């Protein structure tokens, strides 16, 4: 049975990580319409929260809004109990929120750049001191994630556009994990 192959892990539910209260988000293409209205939920450490719905139901727009890329009309977002105004991906990452987007080619990586540069993009603060990049530290982190996620490439200098789709997705996941998120959002991650 599937329960035998993949036994349920006992996970301790911890502190509140994210609370969304009465969020209303404008439709991305029809500004006279809202795609989501009055959405509220809470996410705790150790929980997995799934969103489902038909195409156009607002799943992607909700995640993009929490990542600082949506048009939030009303509502509040709390991260670890503190009210936040997340208006950019940089602000989301600073608050421990990352997003693996549905469209990795347009939103997840820069194809002509190397694996190393793509993985490092969202964690420049971790691999630099006084705004000066520390290549030894960058190489350490990138090689660690290439090994952990089994990214198949001759080196970290290979352009991401030259990788298979699965390895491209692993680069995007590595980039997100290197940022040490407390909240990892995935929009159609197996696509």
Task: Give the location of each predicted region.
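Glycine-rich phosphate-binding loops of nucleotide-dependent enzymes
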Residues: 1-191
């Amino acid at each position: 049975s599937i329960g035998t192959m993949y036994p349920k892990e006992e996970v301790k539910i911890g502190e509140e990580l994210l609370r969304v209260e009465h969020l209303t988000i404008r439709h991305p293409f029809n500004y006279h319409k809202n795609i989501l209205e009055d959405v509220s939920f809470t996410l705790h450490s150790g929980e997995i929260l799934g969103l489902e719905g038909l195409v156009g139901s607002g799943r992607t727009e909700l995640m993009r809004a929490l990542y600082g890329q949506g048009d939030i009309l009303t509502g509040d977002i709390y991260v670890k109990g503190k009210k936040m105004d997340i208006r950019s991906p940089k602000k989301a990452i600073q608050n421990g929120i990352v997003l693996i987007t549905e469209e990795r080619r347009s939103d997840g990586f820069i194809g002509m750049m190397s694996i190393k540069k793509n993985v490092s993009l969202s964690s420049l603060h971790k691999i630099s001191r006084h705004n000066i990049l520390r290549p030894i530290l960058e190489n350490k982190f990138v090689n660690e994630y290439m090994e952990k996620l089994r990214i198949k490439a001759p080196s970290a200098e290979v352009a991401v556009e030259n990788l298979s789709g699965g390895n491209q997705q692993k680069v995007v996941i590595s980039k997100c994990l290197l940022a040490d998120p407390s909240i990892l959002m995935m929009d159609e991650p197996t696509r």
